[in-house]
Design a protein with these regions (language model features):
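N-terminal glycine-rich anion-binding loops that anchor highly charged ligand groups
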Residues: 1, 10-56, 64-71, 290-291
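Short glycine-rich or small-residue beta-strand-to-loop segments that form or flank ligand, phosphate
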Residues: 11, 42-46, 78-83, 298
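Acidic, glycine-rich active-site loops and adjacent beta-strand->loop/helix elements
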Residues: 81-86, 111-117, 156, 222-223
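Helix N-cap / loop-to-helix initiation motif
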Residues: 17, 34-35, 51, 93, ...
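A glycine-rich phosphate/pyrophosphate-binding beta-strand-loop-alpha-helix module
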Residues: 42, 90-146
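Glycine-rich anion-binding loops and their surrounding alpha/beta cores
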Residues: 9, 64-67, 89, 104, ...
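Active-site cofactor/substrate anionic-group-binding motifs, chiefly glycine-
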Residues: 49-111
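N-terminal basic/disordered segments at the start of proteins
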Residues: 1-14, 79-85
Length: 349
């Protein structure tokens, strides 16, 4: 099925099977569709409602066309979420990644610059002095050496450029907003994945199952966060051994002090970086608590602890002994060395 036929098919309220969706996505990602065709298709798909099969097929095409980051790690975890929750908080999942890495889980962090927030993961890490423009081999070196590496989405998903204009002109969420966390270039099989709307919690968990993920938690809080929240209950769909169970996480249950969402908000990347550093240095407050909560969940799905409660305790210890701060310094140094070696290689050529 080509994209012209799919627009009519989807506009009439019909779903695409995986074979049909694969054909259309290949056409888009290979630059064989016009901006107006892409925009029409994405809009029709959104109005109909994207299905699990459609999202799975689209993610598989993106995975096939992305770069491949090959590491020596047996377990890789990602904390990339959909973003777009509109809450303007500091970079919770990115900060959590350093706590997770300090516990011994290799983190292949996938991310991008901000679209709707004050600071995207790439914006924060760049402000923190980390080189985000590494090629796949250099990212793999960072992960193997330091347990953490960052994959800047535009560097690894070159084919996405064919949909960029249509997406920009549309200016609304489409299936592509869901695909980023589903297309980790390192093939991470363990994920803590926040979504911008609770309607996607269970479907995205089902997509991860189809894509071969081993363990994952897909989350969305009642206050709108695509994270596990301190200020409201959070809906969770947990994937483990091919089975999905849905439940609610309440911060009070784990002895964490509830806070207002406004306590976590920032206006720019400088403010986000300041909070990032304060958390890694162990300064008490709601920012540290929400990082501990989310990192604890990742330690649980990364098989380091047997429960979320144990994960939270371990995350607290890691921050207290400054090992998460050390991970940040290690990645900063490793990424800069990779950048220097890349420049030397180019000069020698």
């Amino acid at each position: 099925m080509n994209i012209q036929d799919s627009i009519d098919h989807v506009s009439d309220g019909n779903n695409l099977n995986q074979e049909q969706m694969t054909a259309v996505m290949n056409q888009i990602m290979q630059g064989q569709a016009t901006d107006i065709q892409i925009a029409s298709f994405l809009t029709a798909l959104k109005l109909k409602g994207e299905t699990i099969d459609e999202i799975t097929a689209a993610a598989n095409v993106m995975r096939e066309m992305s770069s491949t980051v090959k590491t020596n790690k047996k377990i890789l975890l990602d904390t990339c979420g959909t973003g777009g929750d509109g809450c303007q908080t500091f970079n919770i999942s990115t900060t959590s990644a350093f706590v997770i890495a300090a516990a011994g889980i290799a983190v292949a962090k996938h991310g991008n610059r901000s679209v709707s927030s004050s600071s995207g993961s790439a914006d924060l890490l760049e402000r923190a002095g980390i080189n985000i423009n590494l090629n796949p081999a250099q990212v793999a070196q960072c992960i193997d050496a330091t347990e953490i590496g960052f994959m800047f989405a535009p560097q690894h998903h070159q084919a996405m450029k064919h949909a960029a204009n249509a997406r920009k002109q549309l200016g609304t969420r489409t299936i592509f907003n869901l695909l980023g966390p589903l297309t980790n270039p390192a093939g991470a099989k363990h994920q803590l994945l926040g979504v911008y709307d609770d309607k996607w919690v269970e479907p995205i968990a089902a997509v991860l199952k189809k894509l071969g993920s081993k363990r994952a938690m897909v989350v969305h809080s009642k206050d709108g966060l695509d994270e596990i929240s301190l200020s409201a209950d959070t809906k969770v769909a947990e994937l483990n051994n091919g089975k999905i169970k849905t439940y609610t996480i309440s911060p009070k249950k784990f002895g964490l002090t509830p806070c207002k969402l406004s306590d976590l908000k920032v206006e720019n990347v400088d403010q986000s970086f300041a909070i990032f550093l304060s958390v890694l240095k162990g300064e008490d407050g709601p920012a540290k608590d929400i990082v501990v909560l989310n990192a604890g969940a990742a330690l649980y799905i990364g098989n380091i602890t047997k429960s979320l409660a144990e994960g939270i305790k371990l995350a607290n210890k890691i921050i207290a002994n400054k090992s998460a701060l050390e991970k940040y310094e290690l990645l900063k140094s490793a990424s800069q060395k990779s950048s220097t070696s890349q420049q030397i290689e180019k000069k020698s050529e």
